[in-house]
Amino acid sequence: MFGTNWKAQAGHGGFYQAVADGSYKKIGLDVDIQQGGPQMNNRPLLAVGKIDFLMAGNLLLSFDNVKNGVPTMVVAAIFQKDPQAMFANPGQGDDKFSELAKAPTAFMSKDGQFSFWQWMKAEHGFKDEQLKPYVFNVGPFTADKKSVQQGYSISEPVSMKAQGFDPVVHLLADNGFSTYSTTIETRAEMVRARPELVQKFVDASLIGWYNYLYGDNKAANEMIKKANPEATDANIVYPPPRKLNCKRWVTTPGN
């Protein structure tokens, strides 16, 4: 069982591709994908053996596991550059990332607060007094023109633009947040006891990602839409998956 950290979307496409085109089966693996979401946190399920592999957003929560003695390991990373971003309302003078630290309100999820928010405080002067919970609804952000909000640069802007709203997008990676993203994590015991299985899963996942970016990804996209009815053709193909190319986002052999 492979668990993701959020609802099915194009940013998870390579894993769905590996199921859809048989990349996992060809290497002897029978893989089911359990999507995450507001009501499904897959991270604690990994440590207790309810899932075998986890897709994580960035390395900070993985570091936190190490700090707290949770026996998990990162075995691969798909994205070299994290698509995590902060959004600002247009026309508010927030064209520079440094200006966001002055916003009275920052809508942030719990996971965000425990991971990249800590970096934002340490490196850019954000303060906990700014925090309000992000409930994965952009309404409060668009209504409060002085607020800022976390988001995924290849996800939320699509729904916002469909509503006629074009946010100012600041990639954390362009402002010093250096971490791999869309990582594959498993239990340390799995790496020790079944290294060949771990290697097979990583290899087949990378094949799935290559095929998703450069091959026929229609079947994978249909799986995504079936798993997550909020996923539409419009937000799956924007930005087009092939724009998430190896030079910018995805690790390549030898890198």
Predicted regions span which residues?
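Short, solvent-exposed loop/beta-turn-alpha elements that line the ligand-binding surface or hinge
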Residues: 26, 99, 172-177, 192, ...
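Short, glycine-/small- and polar/acidic-enriched structural segments
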Residues: 1-143, 147-151, 170-171
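Extracytoplasmic/periplasmic substrate-binding proteins
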Residues: 153, 157-174, 179
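Secondary-structure end/capping motifs
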Residues: 192-255
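Alpha-helix/helix-capping structural signal
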Residues: 59-60, 154-155, 189
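A bilobed periplasmic-binding-protein/Venus flytrap-type ligand-binding module shared by bacterial periplasmic
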Residues: 84-94, 181-196
